[in-house]
């Protein structure tokens, strides 16, 4: 039973990655939890609006980093381990938005990708985190599984400099 009332929905408290581990560092951001992940926010980011122009983000100077990078230890599983354990026969759409750890997750999803039809993922190009991604980072796992770029479904432009910060991309077989 779950709080959403859907039999097919359940919550699991761990991270996905390229290996199964009992302990990995996860960095929590209290002010904006959606920015939390296995990579720390970069306090020296040159492109972050929240760091460099906090008033544009509706913040006071220093607020953004004040409660960032709070370290929490969590378990980590490969996507293949999770899908195998739950005996999931196929995946219509695999959605990844994991703050620059998408490539690590895909590395641990070789078997899962074979039974997945569509992958929708985010690519962060700028320096908000201590890691960013390129198309190569994800395509080295997607192309061998038969995926091709179908669409760049969203482009986020940085209002400070006009550069593309991140994109949502769709890959299909």
Regions found by a protein language model. Name each.
Residues 1-173:
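Phosphate/nucleotide-binding beta-alpha loop and adjacent structural elements of enzyme active sites
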């Amino acid at each position: 039973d779950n709080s959403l009332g859907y039999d097919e929905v359940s919550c699991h408290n761990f991270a996905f990655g390229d290996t199964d581990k009992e302990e990995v560092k996860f960095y929590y951001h209290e002010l904006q939890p959606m920015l939390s992940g296995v990579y720390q926010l970069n306090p020296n980011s040159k492109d972050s609006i929240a760091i460099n122009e906090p008033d544009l983000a509706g913040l006071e100077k220093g607020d953004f980093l004040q409660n960032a990078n709070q370290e929490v230890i969590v378990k980590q599983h490969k996507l293949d381990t999770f899908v195998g354990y739950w005996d999931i026969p196929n995946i219509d759409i695999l959605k990844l938005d994991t703050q620059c750890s998408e490539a690590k997750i895909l590395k641990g999803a070789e078997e899962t990708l074979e039974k997945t039809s569509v992958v929708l993922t985010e690519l962060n190009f700028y320096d908000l985190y201590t890691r960013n991604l390129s198309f190569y980072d994800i395509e080295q796992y997607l192309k061998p599984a038969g995926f091709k770029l179908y669409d760049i479904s969203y482009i986020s432009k940085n209002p400070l400099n006009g550069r593309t910060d991140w994109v949502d991309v769709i890959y299909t077989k």
